[in-house]
Amino acid sequence: MAMMTMIDVLERKDWENPVVSNWNRLPMHTPMDLLEKQSLNGLWNFDHFSRISDVPKNWLELTESKTEIIVPSNWQIEFKDKSDVPIYTNVTYPIPIQPPYVPEANPVGAYSRYFDITKEWLESGHVHLTFEGVGSAFHFWLNGEYGGYSEDSRLPAEFDISNLAKEGQNCLKVLVFRWSKVTYFEDQDMWRMSGIFRSVNLQWLPDNYLLDFSIKTDLDEDLDFANVKLQAYAKNIDDACLEFKLYDDEQLIGECHGFDAEIGVVNPKLWSDEIPYLYRLELTLMDRSGAVFHKETKKIGIRKIAIEKGQLKINGKALLVRGVNKHEFTPEHGYVVSEEVMIKDIKLMKEHNFNAVRCSHYPNDSRWYELCDEYGLYVMDEANIETHGMTPMNRLTNDPTYLPLMSERVTRMVMRDRNHPSIIIWSLGNESGYGSNHQALYDWCKSFDSSRPVHYEGGDDASRGATDATDIICPMYARVDSPSINAPYSLKTWMGVAGENRPLILCEYAHDMGNSLGGFGKYWQAFREIDRLQGGFIWDWVDQGLLKDGNYAYGGDFGDKPNDRQFSLNGLVFPNRQAKPALREAKYWQQYYQFELEKTPLGQVFAFTVTNEYLFRSTDNEKLCYQLINGLEVLWENELILNMPAGGSMRIDLSELPIDGTDNLFLNIQVKTIEKCNLLESDFEVAHQQFVLQEKINFTDRIDSNEEITLFEDEELLTVRSAKQKFIFNKSNGNLSRWLDEKGNEKLLHELSEQFTRAPLDNDIGVSEVEHIDPNAWLERWKGIGFYELKTLLKTMIIQATENEVIISVQTDYEAKGKIAFSTIREYHIFRNGELLLKVDFKRNIEFPEPARIGLSLQLAEKAENVTYFGLGPDENYPDRRGASLFGQWNLRITDMTTPYIFPSENGLRMETRELNYDRLKVRAMGQSFAFNLSPYSQNQLAKKGHWHLLEEEAGTWLNIDGFHMGVGGDDSWSPSVAQEYLLTKGNYHYEVSFKLT
C-alpha cells in the first residue's frame, strides 16, 4: 500500500465504503502514559478545498500552504470560509440521505507539518503516531509515503510509523474529510464541525513493550476482601516477564508476577463518587535479569457495580443518579476542551450536587475520565453512534452491513476506557432505533465485561428505552405521572408493568432550554419515594453557543442550512460556564441533606430533623447553621458541627425559639463545608432549606394627609391631584397614562396597562425544527387566538369622589378576533397621601387558551442602580421553579434582575413579593403577594429580538407586576409541558397592589 499514489488512495473512496473503517490502524488499548512522547500540537500548515477533486495531484510534493491553523481545533472556527461553516442541526442530517454516499462537494482540510525524530528513537524501538480525535475521516502520509486511514471522530487512531519515519526532519501530511459514511452514524444534537480537534502526538516504544492491560476488582459479598486481577499483553512476551505492584498511597500492599495475576486486598478502601479513593498500580515489563523494558502506573479504584432486586447498586448501596448530559464544547474552540475547562465543569457539578455524567453522545477525551476517577463522578460512557435522522431510525442499525462499523465504535470504546472506576455503565449509543446490531453489541458487552450494566434507549416509539439491549429502563423525557410525546409510559406507569423489574434511570429529562426546568422538583419527589426510580440525566450541561464577532451564535447565524435555530441552547450553564438560575434549582432538589420540621398537634414548632443522603460519607467536614429571621433581620441563630453517619439523621431541638406570633418568621437552615475539600471551598453552602413559620402581609396604616384631593376632567383625560402629585387617566381605555410627582416630573414613560402575554419562552415556542410549526405550542395558540393583538374595549368608567379619596372604576373587555377573551374591572383608589391602590377583578372566557400572565405593565421614568424587595430571591423564580428560592428582603443591582438568555424571552420574575422599592416608588401587596420583574427591555422587544446582544436598552425601566403567572415548564421543550396546577385555568382572579412615592 505504501507504493500507492495519493490519487490511487483517493480513488478508492474509503470514506464511502461500508466495510472499510481503517487502514493500518493499531488495535485499541488502555492509554499508556509513561512512555516518552512528543506533542505535535501547535501551528500546522493548512489548505482548505471545497471538494476532494480540488486537492492538487501533487499536493504531497508541495511545501507551502496558504495559511496556518492551530491543532487541535475545528477548521470552521479557525479558518473562516462562508462555503464551509459550522452547522447546527438536531435531527436533520446536514447532507442528503444516501448512505454510504456523501456529496461530491465534500470540504477537505489539508494539514501538514514538520517534526524531528532522533536517531535514538529509530534505532532502539518503535515510533507510534496517535490522532486523539479527527472528524470525520482522514488519510495521512509521512515523508510522501502512505501511512493509513481512520474513522470515528471521538476515539484515538494509532499507527506504527517506524518504517516511514527517518532521522531528523519528517513531513506529515493529513487529508481530513468533512463528510464520510460515518456522518450517518454521528448525527448527534450538536454543531457539525470537522478537523483535527484533539491532540496529536508521537510516542516512542521499546522493542519489548506493553500492548494492553486490563484491571478488574472483584469484591466479595461483604465487601471486605477484593481480588485485583490483572491481565496484560506485551510485544515479544517470550523474552519478558511482568511485575505487578499495588500501592496504597506510598505503602506497598501487594505484588505478584505474570501476565495473568491477582492481588488480594483485605478491607479495601472502596471507590465512589463520594470518596473517590484510588490505589496506584505499578506494572514493570523486564527481561529475565531485571532490566526494565517498559514501566506504567495506573490509578485504580476498587468498587462493585451490580443490579440487585431491581436497583442499580454501587458497593451494595442503591444509587440515586444526580446526572447531567454533557457535550464536549467551548464557545471559543468548539469541540476542543482544555483540562482547565474540564476541571471547572467538574467543580461546578460537584458544587451543585451532581454525581453522574452521561458522555452524550460519544466517548470523551481520555483526560476527562481520569479527572472523574480523581474527583469522583459516575460516568455513562457512550459509543459514538446516532442515526436520529434516518427513517426508520433503525434503517442502518438493523442492517448487518454496518455491524462491523458499529462494533468497532463500541468495542474500541470499551477497550480504551475499561480500567476507569468512574465508568459504571456502557451505552451503545443514542437515538438509533433498535436493530439486530444493537443486540449483538449488547451481547458482546455482557460477555466481555460482566461487571458493568449496559444502557441503550433507542429514541423511537417502539423501544421506549426498554429493549432487550439494555439492563436499565432508560426513557427520554418521560413525565412522572402522565404520558408524553417521547414516552407513552409515565414513570409511575413503568413501575406497574407486569414482569418488569429493571431499574429506571432517565437517560434524558428536564430539558433546560432557555428559561426552563419548571416542575423539576416533582421528579425528585418521585425518585425519593419509589425505589426503582433511580434518577436521571438532565439535558444538558452547557449552552452550545459559539462565539461569533464576540457574541454567542446559534443555528442559522453562520448561514448554515439546515439548522435548528436556538435548540443548541439547552444548558444549565451559559457557554462561558456562568450558572443559570436553573442550575441552582437543580442543586436544591438534588442536595444530599433533607430537612423535616416537627410540630405539635397545635402547630407549634419544636424541632427539625436533618437526614444525610450520602451512601458512604459520614459528615466529617460539615457544619449546620440555622437562623430565625423575620425577613429583615436575624432574630436568633445557632451553629453546630454535623455528626451523622451515611444515611443517618440528626434531630435539632427548637423549643427555645423566640416565636411571638406577630411577625413574618422564617427558619433558614444551611449546611456548609468547614475546610476546603475535593474542589469545594471552605464555608461553601452544600444544602439549604427555609421553613415558613409565620407568614403575614403587614398592612402599614395609611398615613393621612391634610392635602386636598381634587379632580379635573375633560373629554379625553381625567386628572386627580393628591399630595401635590397628578394622576392622569386616559378616558379612552381607563389606563393611568401619566403620573407627575410634586415637582412636576414624569414618573411614567408608558402608561400603566394590563398585560396577559409574555415574551415567549422556548418552551412556549415548542418544536425545534425550523420548517415545522406545532399548533399545540403555547405561542401558536396565543398567536392564533389573537392574544398578542388584543383590542381594548372600554365598557364603563365610573368616578366617585369623597373627602379622603377618589375611586375610579373601569370595566374593560379585551377582544380577540371578534370574541371577548378577557374582562376586567379595575378599581383605582387615590388617597390624600398620594397613594394609589389598584384592585383588579379578572374574568376569562374559558373557551380560550389560558393566558401567560394576569398583570400590569408600566414603563417607569427612573433608571436606578439598585432595587430592594421583600419576596422570593435572590434568583429569578417562577411558580413551578421556586424550590431554591428564599423569602427575605433582597437588595440587588438592577443588572441582577435580568437573566441574559442568549435567545431573549420573559425572564427575571420574582414571586411572592410583599413590597418593592425602586428609586422613590414603593409597590406593596394588599391581601396577597404579587410577582414582578424589572428590566431595561420591554416584553415587546424581548419577543422580537433573536439575540440578547441585539437588545437595545430603552429609556427608564420596564416594570411588570403580575397577580398571577403561569409556570415555565421543562419536562421537554417541544410539547406543552407546564403542569396543570401551574396554568391559569380558573375563570376568575383577583389581586390588589398599592403604588406610592416615598
UniProtKB/Swiss-Prot annotation:
SMART domains: Bgal_small_N. This is Beta-galactosidase. Changing residue 712 to L: In strain: ATCC 7962. It comes from Lactococcus lactis subsp. lactis (strain IL1403). GO terms for biological process: lactose catabolic process. The gene is lacZ. It catalyses: Hydrolysis of terminal non-reducing beta-D-galactose residues in beta-D-galactosides. Keywords: Glycosidase, Hydrolase. The keyword Hydrolase applies. Belongs to the glycosyl hydrolase 2 family. GO terms for cellular component: beta-galactosidase complex. One of its GO terms (molecular function) is carbohydrate binding.
